[in-house]
């Protein structure tokens, strides 16, 4: 389908994106019209989609979209939540008309109602979920393009792009790839440079998950402010008198100096109380009143150490 042109060949980075998003993973059931898009079947019963045929059908769908002169005549519909954000992003990038949410029956056939439209091309996310617009498109001869899984019915589908249309990552990546190829074929962006729009913008996000992330971010910001307010408070300023010279500003009081007599070693020895060896004191000295005056002169001691006799022999 790419005409053996190197420019239109699938790059390695595109294959890695397909594998990371799980685009090659089909369902456990297989429709007979989707049999030639299946590469093999895994041991757990999941069918593997041939990514080469996915890329070829993606280029064919992009050529069909580019062939419409007025981009507003291209109608993009997704009744499932996983594809509504991707559909809005695709319509914003390519200028198509979108119907996200519930499709009002009679939009393509009932000319009386205010929401009547006559598109020249119809794109849907899931042929099973979007069966009503496909049926009405068949009544008014509108060509249709659909993202089809292995178990999707191909009734009223003109161009089927085989891929995983159940996962929100796969659906977002397929709409991102289709929008990029449309812009490249129109000449809006160059093939030599990567597109500055990330595929993450096309992914569906649960509103509860967004609320939890916002709540966690708010709690983190409040905790950070409290922490900074507790530890980064400005220090208290104390007014100190300015003194030019410390020796002049501080008054030094005069203290009289007392003279003390030097104590000799003999007087210190005489003032010490006698100590008896072998005697144990069990009373508390601090509770007993002092009975002896230590400041008085010591009593005269006997000078006779040898007894009554002086005979040492």
From Swiss-Prot:
Keyword rRNA processing in annotation: no
Q: Which GO terms describe its cellular component?
A: cytosolic small ribosomal subunit; nucleus; plasma membrane
The source's domain of life comes to Eukaryota
Which residue ranges are recorded for the region named Laminin-binding?
Answer: 161-180, 205-229, 242-313
S-S bonds: none
- Which PROSITE patterns does UniProt cross-reference here? RIBOSOMAL_S2_1, RIBOSOMAL_S2_2
Annotated positions of the N-acetylserine modification: 2
Q: What else is known?
A: This protein appears to have acquired a second function as a laminin receptor specifically in the vertebrate lineage.
Q: What does this protein do?
A: Required for the assembly and/or stability of the 40S ribosomal subunit. Required for the processing of the 20S rRNA-precursor to mature 18S rRNA in a late step of the maturation of 40S ribosomal subunits. Also functions as a cell surface receptor for laminin. Plays a role in cell adhesion to the basement membrane and in the consequent activation of signaling transduction pathways. May play a role in cell fate determination and tissue morphogenesis.
Checking HAMAP family in the record gives: Ribosomal_S2_euk (MF_03015), Ribosomal_S2_laminin_receptor (MF_03016)
Query: What name goes with this protein?
Result: Small ribosomal subunit protein uS2
Q: Which organism was this protein described from?
A: Solea senegalensis (Senegalese sole)
The gene behind this protein is: rpsa
């Amino acid at each position: 389908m790419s005409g053996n042109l190197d420019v239109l060949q699938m790059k390695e980075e595109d294959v890695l994106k397909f594998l990371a998003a799980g685009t090659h993973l089909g369902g456990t059931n297989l429709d007979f019209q989707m049999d030639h898009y299946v590469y093999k079947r895994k041991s757990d019963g999941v069918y593997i989609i041939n990514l080469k045929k996915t890329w070829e059908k993606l280029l064919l769908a992009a050529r069909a979209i580019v062939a419409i002169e007025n981009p507003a005549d291209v109608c993009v519909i997704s009744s499932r939540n996983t594809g509504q954000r991707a559909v809005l992003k695709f319509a914003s990038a390519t200028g198509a008309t979108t119907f996200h949410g519930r499709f009002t029956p009679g939009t393509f056939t009932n000319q009386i109602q205010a929401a009547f439209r006559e598109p020249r091309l119809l794109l849907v996310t899931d042929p099973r979920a979007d069966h009503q617009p496909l049926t009405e498109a068949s009544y008014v001869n509108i060509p249709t393009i659909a993202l089809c899984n292995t178990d999707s019915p191909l009734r009223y589908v003109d161009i089927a792009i085989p891929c995983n249309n159940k996962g929100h990552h796969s659906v977002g990546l397929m709409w991102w790839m289709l929008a990029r190829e449309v812009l490249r074929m129109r000449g809006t962006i160059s093939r030599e440079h990567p597109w500055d729009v990330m595929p993450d913008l096309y992914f569906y996000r649960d509103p509860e998950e967004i609320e939890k992330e916002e709540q966690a971010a708010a709690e983190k910001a409040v905790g950070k402010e409290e922490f900074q307010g507790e530890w980064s408070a400005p220090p208290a300023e104390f007014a100190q008198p300015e003194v030019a010279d410390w020796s002049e500003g501080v008054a030094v009081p005069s203290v009289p100096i007392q003279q003390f007599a030097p104590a000799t070693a003999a007087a210190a020895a005489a003032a010490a109380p006698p100590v008896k060896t072998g005697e144990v004191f069990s009373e508390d000295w601090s509770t007993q009143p002092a009975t002896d005056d230590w400041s008085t002169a010591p009593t005269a001691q006997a000078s006779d150490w040898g007894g009554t006799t002086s005979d040492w022999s």
